[in-house]
Every structure is written in C-alpha cells, then in structure tokens.
Amino acid sequence: MRDILLTLILAGLLPVSLRRPFIGALVFAVISLANPHRLTWGFAYDQPWAQMYALATLAGILFTRERIVGDSIRRYLPVLVYLAWMGVTTAYAFDHPSAMFRWQQIIKVHLMCLVTLMLLSDWKRVKQLVWVAVCSIGFYGLKGGIFTITTGGEFRVWGPQSSAIEDNN
C-alpha cells in the first residue's frame, strides 16, 4: 500500500516539475533528505526517484518561462570553487577507485544544489526550501524520538537504509 501511495504521489508530481522546475527541486530535496521510498517494502524501494526528478527539473529549466537567477557568477563562486577543490583532492586520493565512485555520487547532488540555487529567485522560495529541509529531517527526529521514548532508549535510532542519514552520528 505504501508503494502504491508513494508512487502515485511522486509520479503525479513529475509532470508538475516539468512545468514548474522549482517544485521538482523541492521534491528532489525531500527525496534526498527524507528518502521516503526507503520506508516502503516493494517496487518503489529501489526506484531511482532522485534521478527522475533531477532529469525532470533540468528539462523543466530548459523550457520554463519563469525567471532563473543566473546573472552573476558571484552567487555560485563558492560552490564552484568547492567542487573544483573536491575534483583536485579526488584526483590525488590514495584509494582512487573508491574516491572516484564517491565523487561521482556527490557531484550529482551538488549539481542539483546549483540548479536549486538558480531557482531561488525570491525570499518565499528560500523559506519553502528551508521548510522542506526541516520537515524532511524533522520527520526522522520525531519518529526516532517516539521510538526512543516507547522503548525506553533500549535500541539505537537509525535513518533509512542507503541514505546520507543512515548511520547513528
């Protein structure tokens, strides 16, 4: 049941993100931070939802008429310098194959961060993105808090499997 509900919601929002790329960026943030598909048990568990929304958002940017903030390199310079430095350090890593694998994963996320930064055209959108991040991470804080209280702190609280917040740190 969770699979069907999540698939209907995410599949229904995909065309919306083609018309309004900022919605796609918000859904990408939810998928990246909350990993809702990892709370399912069936076919939706391993679907590449983040990839679908990244592609839909990028396609939406190509065809949108809304204002995209790309006028000044100063806005993106810190992120671009950081990405360049990550590339340099990855090239000289001791365990190069492992470092390249991780770099390929992380560069995709940072690409979407740049895309989201381009779509933050006003203060309202910044607030929306902050609330999406707060609610996505706060969900697991609330869920973990309730679990800890009901079990008396006997077990560890883990995040969703194969996610950035999987471990206990």
Specify the residue positions occupied by each region the protein language model found.
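Transmembrane signal-anchor hairpin modules in multi-pass inner-membrane enzymes, especially those
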Residues: 1-88, 97-101, 118-136
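Hydrophobic alpha-helical transmembrane segments
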Residues: 16, 83-93, 115-169
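Hydrophobic transmembrane alpha-helices of multi-pass small-molecule transporters
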Residues: 36-37, 109-113, 141
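Juxtamembrane helix-loop transition sites at the ends of transmembrane segments
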Residues: 41-43, 110, 158
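Short amphipathic alpha-helical "recognition" segments used for binding
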Residues: 55, 108-112, 147
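Non-cytosolic membrane-interface motifs at loop->transmembrane helix junctions
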Residues: 98-105, 159-163
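Hydrophobic alpha-helical segments of small multi-pass membrane proteins
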Residues: 105-108, 134
